[in-house]
Amino acid sequence: MKSTNFKKTFTYSRRSFVGAAAASAFSFSFLPSRVFGANQRLQVAGIGVGGKGKGDFDGLAMHGDVIAACDVDARRLDVSVRKHPDAVKFSDFREMISQMGDKIDVMNVSTADHTHAPAAMMGMRWGIHVYVQKPLTHTVWEARQLATIAREEKICTQMGNQGTASDGLREGAEFIRAGGLGKVKEIHAWTNRPVWPQAPTVIERPAEVMAVPDHLDWNSFIGPAPMRPYHSSYTPFKWRGWWDYGTGALGDMACHTTNLAFMGCELTQPTTVESVNTGPINAETFPSWASVNLDFPKTDKRGPIKFYWYEG
């Protein structure tokens, strides 16, 4: 149970997503830390509780009492909270945190990629511990901001990655670090994705205008992205292929297929990153395929490594 008595009320304009989430994120550092008694249970909330988020939410719920849940899709939200009849339901994470942030101890963020950072930022500035589904953020800048906030707030954070959570991957990384593969000089990783619509079949926004389904909070799905009319080509799931919402095959799968190599070879920052080949580029969706080369410098533990990524 949370020890703070602070309560904050916020009002939002329809399109003040970035200002509301980011500004509030950088304004709440005065909130006190939690103090737990021996018999107190964690107060749990979820943002994005359908699809993969349902697994994250259910796992988190095993460690405490669910008091709030948020999803832009009311149908998925209703399914996910059936086991938690006392949970307060929201379609807008800003409303959930502003109304219940002083009660929430820990939450998952498992939304579309482009709203990972705004939701996590706001929660972290309230002192809420967060589990954010991969990829961590939509941009590198956002990831750096989350790292800064985590240090300042001294809270627990984790990026969700199923493979990394398994003993097999961690043991494999230990094997590589112990020299089991000898001197690693090259790494090749790949994925058959995309398995969702994007280039070359989808390169423009749909011209058709659809009515927003009654169960969908379209404004909250759009979040910090530029507003556009609703179409079923965007959600659920299909947002992965759109620049405004997803991170393409690289963001969706590289967290999985490259992580063993990154952990085992202790890779950090590359010295060069080169897109050596790709399908045609357009302004709306990711290319149908790509090849990317990365160079990692030598360290006191190993020599330089050339990393090759293939998708499509």
Task: State the predicted function of each range.
Residues S3-S24:
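N-terminal secretory signal peptides and thylakoid transit peptides that target proteins
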Residues A20-H84, G163-S166, I176, A261:
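N-terminal Rossmann-like dinucleotide-binding module
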Residues R41-L42, G64-V66, P85-D86, D102-V106, ...:
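Loop/turn elements at helix/coil->beta-strand transitions in domains of secreted/extracellular proteins
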Residues Q43-I47, I67-D71, N108-V109, Y131-V132, ...:
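Structural recognition of the beta-strand scaffold that forms the well-ordered cores
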Residues G55-L60, V79-R82, A117-M122, E142-A143, ...:
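Short, solvent-exposed loop/turn and secondary-structure capping segments
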Residues A87-Q145:
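Beta-loop-alpha module in the N-terminal Rossmann-like domain of NAD(P)-dependent dehydrogenases
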Residues H129-Y131, T137-S220:
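A contiguous active-site-proximal alpha/beta segment in oxidoreductase catalytic domains
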Residues E171, K183, H188-P194, Q198-G312:
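Contiguous beta-strand/loop segments that form the cofactor/metal-binding neighborhood of enzyme cores
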